[in-house]
Curated annotation (Swiss-Prot):
This is Eukaryotic translation initiation factor 3 subunit J. It comes from Homo sapiens. The modification Phosphotyrosine is found at residue 254. The modification N-acetylalanine is found at residue 2. Residues 1-11 have a biased composition (Low complexity). It is found in: Cytoplasm.
Length: 258
């Protein structure tokens, strides 16, 4: 009986050993905690994937924002153009108002009134021209004298040289002197009396110098015409005397022959 009981006990232990199943998760991961860490790692992978989706969404949002920036820049440019047009119109209205109802803070001479009207008219024409250029998109690229906008003394000196070269190329024309007379009068009409006196004095000095040069040139021509010994008339008289003496000798010889 004892031997049978021992054999039965060994059989039970063998069955227990044969059918015992180890947890593969514990065998590989080293326990329940390790197995749990493994699944948590897989969850983290899913989180990374979610972050990639977030990055894609952010890129899409940035791409959608860029056109909005461009639109806002266009709006700013359009607003600037409108503001400039408003200022231009306001300036035109002020000029028109001054032309229709000129203010007279002081008593002006007829010349000064004419100069003021001409100046305002010129401003209005320039304003209209600029507005037309902006409306039709005309290119304002200019060169030479038209490109200059003198503000300093050196700028005006250079501007004067270019202007002189432009005008003096027509000095051989029959209408050049009358053209300058009208031009000088028109450009000086808005000047003050003191400035006009300076210009007048400068022209007076120039006129005196030209008169001296003319007198000197006439004196040189007279000296060239003078001949020693009585001049041209004396020379002609001597020639006639010689001719007469020759005639007299010829007649005398003819009479002796007869």
């Amino acid at each position: 009986m004892a031997a049978a009981a021992a054999a039965a006990g060994d059989s039970d232990s063998w069955d227990a050993d044969a059918f015992s199943v180890e947890d593969p998760v514990r065998k590989v991961g080293g326990g329940g905690t390790a197995g749990g860490d493994r699944w948590e790692g897989e969850d983290e992978d899913e989180d990374v994937k979610d972050n990639w989706d977030d990055d894609d969404d952010e890129k899409k949002e940035e791409a959608e924002v860029k056109p909005e920036v461009k639109i806002s820049e266009k709006k700013k440019i359009a607003e600037k153009i409108k503001e400039k047009e408003r200022q231009q119109k306001k300036r035109q209205e002020e000029i028109k108002k001054r032309l229709e109802e000129p203010e007279e803070p002081k008593v002006l001479t007829p010349e000064e009134q004419l100069a003021d009207k001409l100046r305002l008219k010129k401003l209005q024409e320039e304003s209209d021209l600029e507005l037309a250029k902006e409306t039709f998109g005309v290119n304002n690229a200019v060169y030479g004298i038209d490109a200059m906008n003198p503000s300093s003394r050196d700028d005006f000196t250079e501007f004067g040289k270019l202007l002189k070269d432009k005008i003096t190329q027509y000095e051989k024309s029959l209408y050049y002197a009358s053209f300058l007379e009208v031009l000088v009068r028109d450009v000086c009409i808005s000047l003050e009396i003191d400035d006009l006196k300076k210009i007048t004095n400068s022209l007076t000095v120039l006129c005196s110098e030209k008169q001296k040069q003319e007198k000197q040139s006439k004196a040189k021509k007279k000296k060239k015409g003078v001949v020693p010994g009585g001049g041209l008339k004396a020379t002609m008289k001597d020639d006639l005397a010689d001719y007469g003496g020759y005639d007299g000798g010829y007649v005398q010889d003819y009479e002796d022959f007869m």
